[in-house]
Amino acid sequence: LRELMQARVPQMVEQLGEFVNLESPSLDVAHLQHTAKYLADLFADVTGKKAEVIPGANGPHVHWKGSDDTKVLIVGHHDTVFPLGTTSTRPFSVEGDIARGPGIFDMKAGIVQAIHGLSAISDSSQVEMLITADEEVGSYTSRELIESRARATGAVLVLEPSADGGALKIARKG
């Protein structure tokens, strides 16, 4: 599996660059529609399975299921805190082993890696992934969907980046 994923790094970096340069500020529904479509297409290209784009008042969410009998939910978000136009001064870039750009850390890189990870495991039938459009503004329109899918699966992995020093986040603050 390690060799397979290592071989995919150039493809993942290219896809990450496309995703980062598609700006997705919270509450900018038009731009969030573009990133939702990009993610749905990426799911299809990488996994061979179709993802559903679910309309939301604050922007569309993207939902992919390995089957109708999933046990694990992976949650992420495609909205960012960066205002429209940020990529004109801070576009995606790679220097050595470091990629930079708006939204890369929270959480566009994790989403690209997770999609590739799902396609690389021999059986992803018990996994589903939900990428929401409003996490940075409180998840008000996605909360019910997240809670419903979490109850249905029973186990949830959130793609939130590590805390300072690489510590694993195990709870939501507040």
Regions found by a protein language model. Name each.
Residues 107-174:
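Acidic/histidine-rich catalytic neighborhood of metal-dependent amide-processing enzymes
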